[in-house]
Curated annotation (Swiss-Prot):
SUBUNIT field: Heterotrimer of UreA (gamma), UreB (beta) and UreC (alpha) subunits. Three heterotrimers associate to form the active enzyme.
InterPro entries: Urease_beta-like (IPR002019), Urease_betasu_sf (IPR036461), Urease_subunit (IPR050069)
The organism of origin for this protein: Streptomyces avermitilis (strain ATCC 31267 / DSM 46492 / JCM 5070 / NBRC 14893 / NCIMB 12804 / NRRL 8165 / MA-4680)
One Pfam family this sequence matches: Urease_beta
Pathway this chain belongs to: Nitrogen metabolism; urea degradation; CO(2) and NH(3) from urea (urease route): step 1/1
Gene Ontology MF terms: urease activity
Record-given protein name: Urease subunit beta
HAMAP family to which the protein is assigned, alphabetical: Urease_beta
Enzyme Commission number(s) from the entry: 3.5.1.5
Family (UniProt): Belongs to the urease beta subunit family.
Keyword tags: Cytoplasm, Hydrolase
Reaction catalysed by this enzyme: urea + 2 H2O + H(+) = hydrogencarbonate + 2 NH4(+)
GO cellular component: urease complex
Localization (cell): Cytoplasm
Amino acid sequence: MIPGEILFADGPVAYNEGREVTRLTVLNAADRPVQVGSHYHFAEANPGLDFDRAAARGKRLNVAAGTAVRFEPGIPVDVELVPLAGARVVPGLRGETGGALDA
Protein backbone atom coordinates (compact mmCIF):
# COMPACT_ATOMS: atom_id res chain seq x y z
CA MET A 1 0.00 0.00 0.00
CA ILE A 2 1.19 3.51 -0.83
CA PRO A 3 0.63 6.22 1.85
CA GLY A 4 -2.63 8.02 0.99
CA GLU A 5 -3.71 5.30 -1.43
CA ILE A 6 -7.41 4.51 -1.53
CA LEU A 7 -8.43 0.91 -2.13
CA PHE A 8 -11.98 0.57 -3.38
CA ALA A 9 -14.13 -2.46 -2.65
CA ASP A 10 -15.75 -4.41 -5.45
CA GLY A 11 -19.41 -3.54 -6.05
CA PRO A 12 -21.59 -0.84 -4.55
CA VAL A 13 -21.39 0.18 -0.90
CA ALA A 14 -24.56 -0.69 1.02
CA TYR A 15 -25.93 1.88 3.45
CA ASN A 16 -29.13 2.13 5.51
CA GLU A 17 -29.79 -1.58 4.96
CA GLY A 18 -32.84 -2.88 6.78
CA ARG A 19 -34.14 0.61 7.53
CA GLU A 20 -37.80 1.47 6.87
CA VAL A 21 -38.02 3.54 3.67
CA THR A 22 -40.61 6.25 3.02
CA ARG A 23 -41.02 7.38 -0.59
CA LEU A 24 -42.23 10.91 -1.35
CA THR A 25 -42.52 13.16 -4.37
CA VAL A 26 -41.06 16.62 -3.79
CA LEU A 27 -41.78 19.67 -5.95
CA ASN A 28 -39.70 22.82 -5.67
CA ALA A 29 -42.36 25.54 -5.95
CA ALA A 30 -39.75 28.27 -5.38
CA ASP A 31 -37.95 30.19 -8.12
CA ARG A 32 -34.45 29.04 -7.14
CA PRO A 33 -32.80 25.63 -6.71
CA VAL A 34 -32.86 24.12 -3.22
CA GLN A 35 -30.34 21.60 -1.93
CA VAL A 36 -30.93 19.34 1.10
CA GLY A 37 -28.07 17.48 2.79
CA SER A 38 -27.97 13.80 3.72
CA HIS A 39 -28.64 14.18 7.45
CA TYR A 40 -30.96 17.21 7.50
CA HIS A 41 -34.35 16.63 9.17
CA PHE A 42 -36.31 16.54 5.90
CA ALA A 43 -39.60 17.73 7.40
CA GLU A 44 -37.87 21.06 8.15
CA ALA A 45 -36.40 21.52 4.68
CA ASN A 46 -36.88 24.78 2.77
CA PRO A 47 -40.53 25.95 2.83
CA GLY A 48 -40.38 26.35 -0.96
CA LEU A 49 -40.42 22.56 -1.26
CA ASP A 50 -43.90 21.05 -1.56
CA PHE A 51 -44.29 17.53 -0.07
CA ASP A 52 -46.01 15.63 2.75
CA ARG A 53 -44.12 17.07 5.73
CA ALA A 54 -46.01 14.93 8.25
CA ALA A 55 -44.78 11.78 6.47
CA ALA A 56 -41.22 13.19 6.53
CA ARG A 57 -41.17 13.94 10.27
CA GLY A 58 -38.21 12.25 11.95
CA LYS A 59 -36.64 11.23 8.65
CA ARG A 60 -33.67 12.12 6.46
CA LEU A 61 -32.69 11.41 2.86
CA ASN A 62 -31.68 7.84 2.04
CA VAL A 63 -28.42 8.90 0.39
CA ALA A 64 -24.75 8.44 1.29
CA ALA A 65 -23.43 10.53 4.18
CA GLY A 66 -22.06 13.89 3.08
CA THR A 67 -24.08 14.01 -0.13
CA ALA A 68 -27.19 16.02 -0.96
CA VAL A 69 -30.15 16.18 -3.34
CA ARG A 70 -30.74 19.29 -5.44
CA PHE A 71 -34.31 20.27 -6.29
CA GLU A 72 -34.68 22.44 -9.39
CA PRO A 73 -37.69 24.79 -9.62
CA GLY A 74 -40.84 23.20 -11.04
CA ILE A 75 -39.39 19.69 -11.41
CA PRO A 76 -40.89 16.91 -9.25
CA VAL A 77 -38.34 14.54 -7.70
CA ASP A 78 -39.05 11.18 -6.05
CA VAL A 79 -36.97 10.72 -2.89
CA GLU A 80 -36.50 7.99 -0.31
CA LEU A 81 -36.33 8.86 3.39
CA VAL A 82 -35.13 6.78 6.35
CA PRO A 83 -35.69 7.44 10.07
CA LEU A 84 -33.11 9.53 11.90
CA ALA A 85 -31.19 7.24 14.25
CA GLY A 86 -29.22 7.73 17.45
CA ALA A 87 -30.77 9.92 20.15
CA ARG A 88 -33.36 11.24 17.62
CA VAL A 89 -32.94 14.82 18.83
CA VAL A 90 -33.25 17.63 16.28
CA PRO A 91 -31.87 20.86 17.77
CA GLY A 92 -32.14 24.18 15.95
CA LEU A 93 -32.55 23.97 12.18
CA ARG A 94 -35.73 25.90 11.33
CA GLY A 95 -37.04 25.62 14.90
CA GLU A 96 -40.07 23.50 14.03
CA THR A 97 -38.99 20.50 16.11
CA GLY A 98 -36.46 21.87 18.56
CA GLY A 99 -35.76 18.73 20.54
CA ALA A 100 -36.59 15.07 20.90
CA LEU A 101 -38.60 13.54 18.07
CA ASP A 102 -40.12 10.84 20.24
CA ALA A 103 -41.15 13.02 23.20
